[in-house]
Amino acid sequence: MRFQPWTSALRFVLAGSLLLTVSVASAGPKEDVRAATMKWGQTLGQNDPDKVVLLYAADGVLWGTLSPTVRADRAALRDYFVTAFKVLPGLKVTFGEQLIRVYGGTAVNTGYYTFGYVKDGETKTLPARYSFTFVKDGENWMIVDHHSSAMPAPPR
């Protein structure tokens, strides 16, 4: 069989198209996890503990910023958010850098966020760091593990 220059070009274009398709397809789950994280932030801003709890898997766990206790079921999660919304009225969250890794049906999002709330008529902030672990459940990414802690003061 005689080598044709156009077959080389065609192979190059097809290989490039395949690589592009793979990279675009692999970007999807990260964006889905980012969207699930943003949904958590938007839902938190509604200050409705029942809605926030629905974003966690039935066996979801929370080690929250405001509590020394791990919350390991939906009733305990709800209790945490009821308290958080009382202690931090008008609670909102703004996300900083997010480092998202996807491992099949599991994903981890690690980063920092800043909580904003109103106290004595004044807006206050609480910078914190977080890790969310998500598991894919059908079309939804559910939170199975969430750790959040106040950002430590810089060393002196």
Predicted regions and their residues:
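N-terminal secretory signal peptides that target proteins for export/translocation
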Residues: 1-8
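Sec/Tat signal peptide C-region and signal peptidase I cleavage site
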Residues: 23-27
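Helix-to-beta-strand junctions that scaffold the AdoMet/dcAdoMet cofactor pocket
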Residues: 57
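A beta-strand edge to alpha-helix "cap/lid" segment located at domain peripheries
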Residues: 28-51, 61-156
